Amino acid sequence: MPIARVRCLAVADVEHEKRVAAEAAAAFVDDGSIVGLGTGSTVAYLLPALAERGLSLHCVATSPRTEAAARELGIEVQPFQGVARLDIAIDGADQIAPDGWIVKGGGGAHTREKIVAAAADRFVVIASSNKAVDVLKPPIPLELLAFGLDATLAELGQTELRDTARSPDGGVIADYHGAVEDPAGVSAHFDACPGVIAHGLFPPEMTADVLIARGDEVEHRVLARPSS
């Protein structure tokens, strides 16, 4: 019984930190902005925080789940087609290293998330304190083409499929279980494999700000200047 109580408190603390980070990020959004909305449990707290501000926003969602949740709160969501740049994109993370490398994609939407992040003038990552790590660890999410899948898996090595999981765009979702102490090298390995649509390693230069909630406080790591 005591063990269960401690575990529940820990979960409550994590959820509180997700909310704190999300609310801090919502303050970065200006009225009239074109906003990229990520996917995941931390973004779930961002949506009501944005809705409560009552801003006039034009949003692009990275998954059907985020799009549906945003619309339910009265947030305008539009297709990404025809939108060349976003003012800001906000998303969660699975792991955040001290040097700014980030792992994303536990939910299988990392290809869309990476496209949206790259299109944003300012990409902001939000997370609870348990996502801050000393060294990145496997697994690293991958989206793969179904064509030539066995050859791709053989070239990648140490990669397992997530059963029948598919991305929002139909790609095969897999996880790389090899060492990732050198994220730049691992990223290059993925990029050199033709069957890899996208991977969950996000380099430091892609991110402008990281907001990590620690209790009621928010640690703000500035990684890069927002694009002009």
Predicted regions: what is each one?
Residues 32-35, 54-59, 101:
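Short active-site oxyanion
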Residues 2-16, 65-228:
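Conserved phosphate- and dinucleotide-binding cores of soluble alpha/beta proteins
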Residues 18-24:
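A short, well-structured juxtamembrane/interface segment
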Residues 37-42:
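Glycine-rich beta-strand-to-loop/alpha-helix junction loops that act as flexible
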Residues 10, 32, 50-53, 138:
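A short, structure-level motif marking secondary-structure boundaries and short turns
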Residues 47-56, 71-75:
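Glycine-rich loop at the start of a catalytic domain that most often binds anionic cofactors/ligands
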Residues 25-30:
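Glycine-rich helix-loop-beta junction characteristic of Rossmann-like nucleotide cofactor-binding loops
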